[in-house]
């Protein structure tokens, strides 16, 4: 089931201590401090989306490797830069958005400072919740999230899975956070690698197709800017029809495929060149790479 969390009004708390969440207790956003550790493009998109959705900047903590980056985030959003250990000690929820290859080092730094009642949310591709549970205090709730770059425009698809100690309320809290930048979907963790292949990497496939179709437009005699505009608007329209009509994509394709027409001739060439099989193979390769990341392989 897809979930889109709407804007909510938030009254900022004043000087609360970190909350202690008992098993089954209800998470309350109005008594939460959230820290984003790793403020690259996705981390910053999540930060800005949360503020637009009603989180008070005073309750948002950030970490950054470079002091100038920390100052930039403070100036732009009014958030509080802290060190990684300070974030672990102060925040109720830790969102880890560093690269997968950097996660082990980050956890080594955090582990001595993370109490077992902190919610830890990982946004790293391919790393299972067990990786965190083995390195953090026993009983620490961990939620795994795979989001994608459309978070930059509040159109992300974020796939959420619970670790061993994460409750329904932890999942709901995670959905509220990532719902600020798009839609969320709960899946068993065993499906995360497949979801990474489809939606985590998915935007890149569409960009690749737009690039190829733009080149085709140039070959057919169109200026690059006009070819680009034609393709992008067609993509937006097609995606909107898929989302809003409820029709199967085959039906929508058939509606524009006239007998002996231009579309069926184009589809024939796509089939002759194995485009469908290539897409399936590409997604299998992405799935396999996600699995390899989980096993610690770098190449």
Model-found features: residue ranges?
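NAD(P)+-binding Rossmann beta1-loop-alpha1 motif at the extreme N-terminus of oxidoreductases
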Residues: 16, 20-85, 89, 155-156, ...
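NAD(P)-dependent Rossmann-like dehydrogenase/reductase catalytic/cofactor-binding core
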Residues: 28, 232-299
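Rossmann-like NAD(P)(H) cofactor-binding subdomain of soluble oxidoreductases
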Residues: 46-47, 67-68, 76-77, 81-160, ...
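Short acidic capping loops at alpha-helix termini that bridge into adjacent secondary structure
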Residues: 57-60, 116-118, 141, 225
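Small-residue helix-packing motif on alpha-helices
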Residues: 60, 70, 88, 103, ...
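Internal alpha-helical scaffold of NAD(P)-dependent oxidoreductase catalytic cores
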Residues: 131-141, 157-195, 207-244, 289
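Short pre-catalytic strand/loop immediately N-terminal to key active-site residues, enriched for Gly-Thr
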Residues: 142-143, 192-197, 249-254
